[in-house]
Swiss-Prot record:
Principal localisation: secreted
Mechanisms controlling activity: Inhibited by the serine protease inhibitor AEBSF.
Cofactor or coenzyme needed: Zn(2+)
EC number: 3.4.24.-
Organism for this UniProt entry: Proatheris superciliaris
Name of the protein this chain belongs to: Zinc metalloproteinase-disintegrin-like proatherocytin
Function: Stimulates platelet aggregation through activation of PAR-1 (F2R).
A GO biological process held by the record: platelet activation
Superkingdom to which the source organism belongs: Eukaryota
Compartments (UniProt record): Secreted
Length: 15
C-alpha cells in the first residue's frame, strides 16, 4: 500500500 495505509487494490489494507 501507500504510506497513508491505503493500497492501490485494497483501499483498506495495511502498508
Amino acid at each position: 500500500g501507500n504510506y497513508y495505509g491505503y493500497c492501490r487494490v485494497h483501499l483498506n489494507t495495511a502498508y
